[in-house]
Amino acid sequence: MNNNLKSRGIMLVMSSPSGGGKTTISQLLVNELQGEIIRSVSVTTREPRNEEVEGKDYFFVTEDEFHHLCNTNQMLEYAKVFGNYYGIPRRFVMDNINNGISILFSIDWQGAFKLIDIMSEHVVSVFILPPSMEELKRRLYNRSGESDMINQRLKEAAFEISHCYRYNYIIVNHNIEESVQQIKSIFIAEKLKTHRKMFLEQVVKSYYI
């Protein structure tokens, strides 16, 4: 055994209102932390779309197989969306965490709260705020340009933001690169926490006591 204190992975849960920047931040974060963090891969009953890869984009199963996974406690959480089931496979998450690989979840507050409730030991949650509602409105307008849709998205954003208080960390996304570095700092600090260190007692006794 060497004195490299290897850490378990974390479940990095990120939420933001539409236009808040979590999709772009997620992509950049995974690129910067290659080999340390991967995106969550869900199980689904829907048909694969063009170029989707089994095990990378989704795990594709039949409805009977999906129900079996749920009934045997192999799903962390699941939901039915537009007639298809989606769920987070327990084994995929835990195998990676126990091998020191972290999982990134880019989800809404409801999904975040479910994971916080059932996997609090492993979850690190970050809520990403826009600089202001005016700035969010500008981003949404640049994205779609439809006033009715923007007004609805702003209402949904206000509701989403009203749930930010339960998250471990809150950042304000003034600048994408700065936000990525802030979350990267959170990631590094959380991985250094004592309770995430594997074989800590053995390493300390072998090398320091």
Swiss-Prot record:
It is found in: Cytoplasm. Signal peptide: none annotated. Keywords: ATP-binding, Cytoplasm, Kinase, Nucleotide-binding, Transferase. SMART domains: GuKc (SM00072). It comes from the Bacteria. InterPro entries: GK/Ca_channel_bsu, Guanylate_kin-like_dom, Guanylate_kinase, Guanylate_kinase_CS, P-loop_NTPase. Belongs to the guanylate kinase family. Essential for recycling GMP and indirectly, cGMP. This is Guanylate kinase. The gene is gmk.
